[in-house]
Amino acid sequence: LQTRPPKEMGGSGEGVNPELLFSAGYAACFLGALRLVAKNSDVQLDDATSVTVQIGIGKDDTSFALSANIIGYLPALSQQQAEELMGKANQVCPYSKATRGNIDVTTSAKV
């Protein structure tokens, strides 16, 4: 697997970059956590339920920093239920645990 820096960092933008791979892993992990907390809460998720993670990268005076925007698509639920499950999933997701206090992470739910 060959990686390339994103255009934002002077790369060609072709192929995969570490941020893309990180977002794919985070999204898959968060979806698993979401399904777990839904099951434990006796909430049935629709098959169309999905998670997208957008990873941002920026530079400060001395280094680079990441940020993550996690968007859950939970079409079978109310907005309140969806937001509650997203919050619970964020507490148990291993990627969220690993990034907590290290990068800015936001979550949102769409129904």
Model-derived features: where do they sit?
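Extended beta-strand/beta-hairpin segments
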Residues: 1-24, 31-111
